[in-house]
Amino acid sequence: MEQAHTQLIAQLNERILAADNTPLYIKFAETVKNAVRSGVLEHGNILPGERDLSQLTGVSRITVRKAMQALEEEGVVTRSRGYGTQINNIFEYSLKEARGFSQQVVLRGKKPDTLWVNKRVVKCPEEVAQQLAVEAGSDVFLLKRIRYVDEEAVSIEESWVPAHLIHDVDAIGISLYDYFRSQHIYPQRTRSRVSARMPDAEFQSHIQLDSKIPVLVIKQVALDQQQRPIEYSISHCRSDLYVFVCEE
């Protein structure tokens, strides 16, 4: 822990001294987030107190407190009186990468798992048909599952896939994209839309989440190398555990 704190303080001081117009509390918060991404800080680590951070970095306690508030609002940390500020189990998910959930989890050094709720053929709803470029009422597979990261439930996902793309639905394990690749179908890129809403009763029946914490809703179309839609998914994700990244 001492080594992690030493590295964090060094990174904070370097960022604070950088000559740009970014507000100090944002520099502070960004540095903590980068330390989590790089593995310097891990889930469950306790940060130094506000007074120590202020003394070691030369910034005011007000600035430190503002940075901690920003981090708490983003779900990066949890603050509790008498216990301190703890790093949450954040999963950073790229909206640009066409790798799929399981592969992204593994690449970030975490353990993925899936609990299947449903795998069945249904008639394609109008909204889904538009996204998949198929006829409304045509056969599609509806795949519903609960996603886990390091044995913690983080999201509920529903996917619709044109029926002709799945020859053996029981062969799909924790990763739909692994199944696609086994059938020589290669997801190339994705189109995503992100919104927020409060958790409903169904979400809370599967995933424990404070009713005051919003759920992130990600609607995504996956396209193959010929730019043909191969999957349309709607994911409801815990906003306190997910960080979505979209970079050019």
From Swiss-Prot:
<dbReference type="InterPro" id="IPR036388">
    <property type="entry name" value="WH-like_DNA-bd_sf"/>
</dbReference>
<dbReference type="InterPro" id="IPR050679">
    <property type="entry name" value="Bact_HTH_transcr_reg"/>
</dbReference>
<keyword id="KW-0678">Repressor</keyword>
<keyword id="KW-0238">DNA-binding</keyword>
<protein>
    <recommendedName>
        <fullName>HTH-type transcriptional regulator GgaR</fullName>
    </recommendedName>
</protein>
<dbReference type="GO" id="GO:0045892">
    <property type="term" value="P:negative regulation of DNA-templated transcription"/>
</dbReference>
<dbReference type="InterPro" id="IPR000524">
    <property type="entry name" value="Tscrpt_reg_HTH_GntR"/>
</dbReference>
<dbReference type="GO" id="GO:0003700">
    <property type="term" value="F:DNA-binding transcription factor activity"/>
</dbReference>
<keyword id="KW-0805">Transcription regulation</keyword>
<dbReference type="InterPro" id="IPR028978">
    <property type="entry name" value="Chorismate_lyase_/UTRA_dom_sf"/>
</dbReference>
<dbReference type="InterPro" id="IPR036390">
    <property type="entry name" value="WH_DNA-bd_sf"/>
</dbReference>
<dbReference type="InterPro" id="IPR011663">
    <property type="entry name" value="UTRA"/>
</dbReference>
<dbReference type="Pfam" id="PF07702">
    <property type="entry name" value="UTRA"/>
</dbReference>
<keyword id="KW-0804">Transcription</keyword>
<feature type="DNA-binding region" description="H-T-H motif">
    <location>
        <begin position="50"/>
        <end position="69"/>
    </location>
</feature>
<dbReference type="Pfam" id="PF00392">
    <property type="entry name" value="GntR"/>
</dbReference>
<dbReference type="GO" id="GO:0003677">
    <property type="term" value="F:DNA binding"/>
</dbReference>
<feature type="domain" description="HTH gntR-type">
    <location>
        <begin position="22"/>
        <end position="90"/>
    </location>
</feature>
<comment type="function">
    <text>Transcriptional regulator that regulates glycogen accumulation in response to the amount of glucose available to the cell. Acts as a repressor of the yegTUV operon, which may be involved in glycogen accumulation. Binds at two adjacent sites within the yegTUV upstream region.</text>
</comment>
